[in-house]
């Protein structure tokens, strides 16, 4: 089973995914940007405060995603793992969409990668997310409260349109993780039918 956990920066994705991975058998956790060459370029660029046209960001994230899927996700799925990725296509839709890139374009450039079996949105108020991010030390280019409000709205709109479960991530991570595990277990049971 292939699962994407999405949400604005500061929504607790990393912490929740770590808890979920402990609760389920044979879980492989990965994230975007990936550890591949394009993903490393994206991380380095962000850390240096680099800015590019949002269309360039969208293309680079899509390129990283294709490489990530082929190099890492697909082989682990074939080996029988539950693969959980922190961020996937919906992150590009939300972030680059909030920066003005048409969603249809983002969907098109990402059409070569398979959709996850399950996408879960962790939802938190952007002001709370910024507090959490500041506790980590530095803000990155996508981390300003007004921008995160736009990103959050796109996530919630997409969740309604696509039927993605939305979890209140303003609660303690352990509670959020329990909800995520329950959703995954239900989805796995329905896939077995």
UniProtKB/Swiss-Prot annotation:
Gene3D superfamilies for the chain: P-loop containing nucleotide triphosphate hydrolases
Residues the record lists as binding ATP: 7-14
One cellular component term from this protein's GO annotations in UniProt: cytoplasm
Keyword tags: ATP-binding, Kinase, Nucleotide biosynthesis, Nucleotide-binding, Transferase
CDD domains registered for this protein in UniProt: TMPK (cd01672)
GO MF: ATP binding; dTMP kinase activity
EC number per UniProt: 2.7.4.9
Domain of life: Archaea
Top enzyme class: transferase
SUPFAM superfamilies: P-loop containing nucleoside triphosphate hydrolases
InterPro entries in the cross-refs: P-loop_NTPase, Thymidylate_kin-like_dom, Thymidylate_kin_CS, Thymidylate_kinase
Reaction(s) catalysed by this chain's protein: dTMP + ATP = dTDP + ADP
Family membership: Belongs to the thymidylate kinase family.
Name of the protein in its database record: Probable thymidylate kinase
């Amino acid at each position: 089973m292939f699962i994407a956990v999405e949400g604005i920066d500061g929504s607790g994705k990393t912490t929740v995914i770590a808890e979920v991975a402990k609760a389920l058998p044979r879980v492989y956790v990965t994230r975007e940007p990936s550890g591949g060459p394009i993903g490393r370029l994206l991380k380095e660029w962000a850390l240096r405060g680099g800015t590019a046209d949002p269309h360039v960001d969208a293309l680079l994230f899509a390129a990283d995603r294709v490489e990530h899927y082929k190099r890492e996700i697909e082989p682990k799925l074939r080996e029988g793992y539950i693969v959980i990725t922190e961020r996937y296509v919906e992150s590009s839709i939300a972030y680059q969409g909030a920066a003005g890139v048409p969603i249809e374009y983002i969907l098109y450039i990402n059409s070569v990668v398979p959709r996850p079996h399950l996408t879960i949105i962790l939802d938190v108020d952007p002001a709370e997310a910024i507090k959490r991010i500041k506790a980590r030390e530095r803000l990155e280019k996508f981390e300003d409260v007004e921008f995160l409000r736009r990103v959050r709205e796109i996530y919630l709109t997409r969740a309604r349109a696509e039927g993605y479960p939305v979890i209140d991530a303003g609660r303690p991570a352990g509670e959020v993780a329990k909800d995520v595990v329950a959703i995954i277990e239900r989805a796995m049971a329905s896939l077995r039918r």
